[in-house]
Curated annotation (Swiss-Prot):
Full protein name: Pentatricopeptide repeat-containing protein At5g61400
Stored SUPFAM superfamilies: HCP-like
Keyword set includes Phosphoprotein: no
Lineage start: Eukaryota, Viridiplantae, Streptophyta, Embryophyta, Tracheophyta
The family this protein is said to belong to: Belongs to the PPR family. P subfamily.
UniProt KW Repeat keyword: yes
Keyword entries, A-Z: Repeat
Source species: Arabidopsis thaliana
Amino acid sequence: MLKLLLPQHRTSVYLFKFQFFNFRFLSQSPSLSNSASSFSSSSLAEAILKCRSAEEAFKLFETSSRSRVSKSNDLQSFSAVIHVLTGAHKYTLARCLIKSLIERLKRHSEPSNMSHRLFNALEDIQSPKFSIGVFSLLIMEFLEMGLFEEALWVSREMKCSPDSKACLSILNGLVRRRRFDSVWVDYQLMISRGLVPDVHIYFVLFQCCFKQGLYSKKEKLLDEMTSLGIKPNVYIYTIYILDLCRDNKMEEAEKMFELMKKHGVLPNLYTYSAMIDGYCKTGNVRQAYGLYKEILVAELLPNVVVFGTLVDGFCKARELVTARSLFVHMVKFGVDPNLYVYNCLIHGHCKSGNMLEAVGLLSEMESLNLSPDVFTYTILINGLCIEDQVAEANRLFQKMKNERIFPSSATYNSLIHGYCKEYNMEQALDLCSEMTASGVEPNIITFSTLIDGYCNVRDIKAAMGLYFEMTIKGIVPDVVTYTALIDAHFKEANMKEALRLYSDMLEAGIHPNDHTFACLVDGFWKEGRLSVAIDFYQENNQQRSCWNHVGFTCLIEGLCQNGYILRASRFFSDMRSCGITPDICSYVSMLKGHLQEKRITDTMMLQCDMIKTGILPNLLVNQLLARFYQANGYVKSACFLTNSSRLKTVSNSC
């Protein structure tokens, strides 16, 4: 491989000499006349090629440059001296001449024509001093000047492969431009012309595989490297591991991680970071923390990326104390928590309902001169609205606007959802208008939230108005939109319109979810169409993922209230066979059915089953059972349940 860099002291001498020559040469008129010269049109190039040394050739070229020869002779003599200098390993001076020639030719022709002229001139040199290395130098100079397409054209036109450094630069340029198919075509072309790939070439190919998602291709490349006796370096192992972690293939990633250590390749911080990120994404935060300890043992300094990944992982695992303790480690290693780290911790506290702690972290950020961004405020506003603290959410909303942080659609949607939960539809609609005035277009989430809000306040007219408005604007309703409207129409005893919307939903290719099925079943039996509800279940019972405990409970409740306790029991059994654990409401529906039919044994067994499942009877359940036991002569059991000290009260009774 050509060594394109000379030692510093030699390079500086050539650069000084060339700059002096270049100034004198370029100061002449760009149009070269046919004035007298000591050489004829082609004799200068011939004389240069006949010189005994590169120094003599360059001196002759420099001296003759004072003469104003023709452009063709200029290009020919340049090509000759570049070949001579390259053959003498004077690469820096050769590249300086190539650069000067490119700049001269660019003034008078398009880059594509210029590259053709220059390539042909260099190729036309007929001499034993012809050096194939000039084309690699030409490629490198084109790349350095930002002329990638010209460099690529030269590499494809060459009769043999450029040197490995030029090939590496070409392939890397294609990867960076995401021209992945060209990477493999050009690589095969280079191989066919004599390129012997090295570990650096393979690293670029691994990068291409990673960005294309070609996992099987990486395995073939690794086998190819092994067959050529090329040892993968830490960067190749890291990108391999990174790809496995991205696809959640942690077992394979672990094997590769151990394999690299077995082969004497020490993981670097990026390798550890990839593994830690993979473990955190799959919820294995303990393994991730174990690798963090390995980093310390290996005497590597963890950076903010490693800490951010760990904080995010522990927050998602609801281990907020551990996540917070990592801040102490960050201080120890001189790593300043960044915005991402704080946003992760704030999000963790919001998901756990610790809004006081989350808002306190905002104040802590500001005390450290770390300005919150739109994500920080959106996380907090969403958390506050979930916890029904809409007034505090609005205060933060006004604060972020005062700080010139522009709310996103997610910010507006969170606050709109908060107002809808409070049934404050006027404020929600005003906020939607403000959203539009601010240049933020309402999206599917905005419309679905507003439609659901109006459905909850029984304003079906306003809900349908928004439904038509969103379709006019080209926003396609989703399953949430349709489910809210279907449920609302059933509650308004308008089954015909509910079924029309369900039909529209299916025609639009939108698959119903578990809430949709629950609304339909609930609507059918409450409209006195229990048989339709059962038929609907039987038609759709293959879609197990679309049935949850709510849908089954609605069906069970309908059957029990209509005296079909045996069929209800079968559905209760079906629910469990689907892997769905009954909740308190499911048990209440079944208990009411058994009590209504005075099925004492079944009632007792169901009560035991409920306790065995880990569901504590609430006040309603205890009262129902107490009255039933008392009416059937089980006084002790009734007294036990009515004893206030033994009542297990739950706020949400069914």
